[in-house]
Amino acid sequence: MTDDIAPSGYQPHRISTLAVLIGFIALLTAWLRRDRRLASIPGPRTYPLVGLGYKLPPKAPALFRKWAMEYGDVFRIRVGWYDWVVINSPEAIAEILEKQAVKTSSKAPSPLGHDVVTGGNRMPTMPYGKEWRNLRSVVRQITTVPMTASFVPSQEFEAKQLLFDLATDNENQRNFYQHMRRYAFSIIMTNTFGTRVKSWDHPDAQNAVRSQAVLRRTSRPGAFLVDELPPLARLPKXXXXXXXXXXXAAKVETGKAPHCYAREIYESRESWYAKGATEEQLAWVSGGLVEAGFETTAGTLNSLVLYLAANPQVQKTAQEELMRAVGPHRLPTFEDTRRLPYIRACVKEVLRMNPILSPGIRHYADEDVVYKEHVIPKGTVLLANTAYLHYDPRRYKDPQKFMPERYLDHPLYSSDYAAMTDPSRRDHFTFSTGRRTCPGARLAENSLTIALAGMLWAFEIRPGLVDGVETEVDMSDDAYLDTGFTLPKPFAARFLPWSEERLQIVKEQWELASKKGYELRGVPVDIEGMTK
């Protein structure tokens, strides 16, 4: 059967041997020609030629924490083709990634993960330059503070369904995991494409999951040998395995599509074309809004459930705050969150403990960079080591403990602290830094805070039961998927209503909302989505 479909002359064993040989020669050449200026930066002993190997080792966050404590502000490693400088202090972050951002805001070349899989159109993996800045401008226009505020009606509406789903569809103690994903996905789909997602088995949700899985695999360090050893990209095409293309295209026709972000981008496309953007890039911007806004928010919400189930005292403190600010007779609203500093602190604390990118945030030096007495050469991968930055005992007392109170003196949004010149004022680095700071950070914090306030108002979150006995909550690294994204593995948890009255309020509020709908930037939205 293989002989019938293989191309003429196709000899996989010879091509594999050729790939290995070219890879070895390329590594040896790179090793002999390596820039020795990095020798002034300390680092762990690793293997010749490949350093740690062609990809990061398992449980890299724990390893990177250990090395940061041993080597200080910066240390160096090698992963495949690239030298890495790992950055471990806010001061070093400010000096390297912010003050010298024009040199350090790029991404390492990714011949397969970026160029092939995304056609070179995906912003998170796009090199810094004119194309990236053009697309960043598109995103900036739809993530301004006023535009972010316009999301609130959809966030409150979806939160009501979330509470209803948690109350009525978690008998197996595991469905909540997908309800969090539906909540986050429906918010961003309604605003971007005008379509609501009523349940997690919605076709759009399943398509997004498949696309996200491809993008996670292809953007992870070491996902493809060709990305860590770029000379392999020069092999004959027959040597490259077929990659699944992941693209989210905005199929919008003027006058027919709902008045959503994808339509706005489509209708203003000529002005973006004039600046150099392409049709494919604008489609990826629309799809990228969904990519950035759904799995990260859902994963953080599920991490919150994990930590809250293990910390009943935190729930007690939050419940007391909710009763003072809201009372037991109505659901909390977004306006109430201004009077819920402890709830907002819970959100900051989970973002500190579980930054969505693991073990940190990667940049790439387009030019030589000077840090103290060190020269970091052009072509070096730069990693903001959140695995250590967020667990530095000098900055955080008992960093392994979930202690929201540590953030009660940080009442502002993360983006506000990121804009400050004093790096020590940063609450955390989860939303990146420098010119690649996440433009949707404020939107994400609102989605998290609205959902959390509602959940803690309505329910006590308890660990799952096995044979009638509560299970111990696993909060170790083993509780998380080893994907380069900090997403908890599915786990068991129960949502117990605080009272029959609150349970009825949850049910009544969703019944009313599902019949009445709401308005989003002046456009009616019903149970299916935007109606015009």
Curated annotation (Swiss-Prot):
One Pfam family matching this protein: p450
- Which leading EC class covers this enzyme? oxidoreductase
Matching entries from Gene3D superfamilies are given as: Cytochrome P450
Q: Which GO terms describe its cellular component?
A: membrane
Q: Kindly list the places in or outside the cell where this protein is found, as annotated in its UniProt entry.
A: Membrane
State the conditions that upregulate or repress this gene.
Answer: Expression is significantly up-regulated at the end of late growth phase, in the presence of Butyrolactone I. Expression is positively regulated by the pgm cluster-specific transcription factor pgmR.
Q: Which family does it belong to?
A: Belongs to the cytochrome P450 family.
Q: What happens when the gene is disrupted?
A: Abolished completely the production of the naphthoquinones derived pigments and leads to the accumulation of fusarubinaldehyde, the methylated product of pmgB.
The molecular function terms in GO held by this entry are: heme binding; iron ion binding; monooxygenase activity; oxidoreductase activity, acting on paired donors, with incorporation or reduction of molecular oxygen
Tell me the pathway: Pigment biosynthesis; Secondary metabolite biosynthesis
Supply the name of the protein: Cytochrome P450 monooxygenase pgmC
